[in-house]
C-alpha cells in the first residue's frame, strides 16, 4: 500500500511487492488499530513525512500497531516512543518494530497512561485516536512537545472538527495545516 511520497506498507502476508524506491514498512496489525488502510492512518503518515529528520525524537500516543512510530523510524527518526493503554497494542507494536529492524535502542514502548509513563520532550508527537481522547489529552501534550515541535492529530470525524479545534486552541495549539480524506481530518499543530 503506497502512502505519501516515501512509504510502502507491506502486510506480512503479501509476498510479491515492488518498493519503487519507497521505505517498506512490514506490518502485522493483529487486533491493534493501524493497518495502513484507514484514512486517518494515511493522513498521519503523509504528515509525518514532512517533519521527520535524522534528529527527530517522536512520541506516538495511542500507538496501536505501532505503524506511525515504526514509519517515523523508517523515515529516519533518531528514536520513537509509543504508549498505549491496550497491552495487546503494545505487544503488537513491539513485534512490528522488531519486524522492521528496530530494537529497544531506538524504539521504546510503554503500556499505560501517557502522563504516568512518559517523560522528556519530543520533536514530533502523533495521536491518531478518537476525538474525545484528543480533547482529553491535548492539555497534557504541551509538556512533552519541544517548543518548535509539531503535534499531529487525527482520528477526527468531520462532525467533531469545531470541538477538537477549540480544545486544541484552548490548550495552546494552533493548526498550521488541515488535511481531509473521506470525512476524516488530520491537523498539524504547533505551540502558539
Features from the language model and the residues they span:
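S-adenosylmethionine
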Residues: 79, 85-191
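Non-catalytic substrate-recognition/targeting regions of SAM-dependent transferases
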Residues: 1-34
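Structural motif
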Residues: 6-8, 23-25, 57, 79, ...
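Conserved SAM/SAH cofactor-binding pocket of Class I
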Residues: 31-114, 118
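Short, glycine- and charge-enriched coil/turn segments that flank and shape catalytic ligand pockets
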Residues: 14-24, 52-55, 116-119
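Structural signal for conserved beta-strand scaffold positions within catalytic alpha/beta enzyme cores
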Residues: 9-11, 26, 60, 111, ...
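Generic structural signal for well-ordered alpha-helical scaffold segments
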Residues: 14, 45-49, 142
Amino acid at each position: 500500500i503506497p502512502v505519501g511520497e516515501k512509504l510502502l506498507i507491506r502486510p506480512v502476508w503479501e509476498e510479491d511487492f515492488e518498493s519503487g524506491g519507497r521505505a517498506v514498512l512490514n506490518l502485522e496489525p493483529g487486533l491493534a488499530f493501524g493497518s495502513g488502510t484507514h484514512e486517518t492512518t494515511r493522513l498521519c503518515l503523509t504528515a509525518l513525512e514532512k517533519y521527520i529528520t535524522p534528529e527527530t525524537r517522536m512520541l506516538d500516543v495511542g500507538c496501536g500497531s505501532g505503524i506511525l512510530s515504526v514509519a517515523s523510524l523508517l523515515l529516519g527518526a533518531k528514536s520513537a516512543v509509543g504508549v498505549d493503554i491496550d497491552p495487546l497494542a503494545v505487544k503488537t507494536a513491539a513485534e512490528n518494530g522488531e519486524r522492521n529492524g528496530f530494537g529497544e535502542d531506538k524504539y521504546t514502548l510503554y503500556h499505560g497512561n501517557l502522563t504516568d509513563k512518559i517523560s522528556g520532550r519530543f520533536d514530533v508527537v502523533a495521536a491518531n485516536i478518537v476525538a474525545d481522547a484528543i480533547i482529553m489529552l491535548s492539555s497534557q501534550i504541551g509538556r512533552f512537545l519541544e517548543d518548535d515541535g509539531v503535534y499531529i492529530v487525527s482520528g477526527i470525524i468531520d462532525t467533531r472538527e469545531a470541538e477538537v479545534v477549540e480544545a486544541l486552541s484552548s490548550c495552546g495549539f494552533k493548526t498550521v495545516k488541515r488535511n481531509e480524506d473521506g470525512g476524516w481530518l488530520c491537523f498539524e499543530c504547533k505551540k502558539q
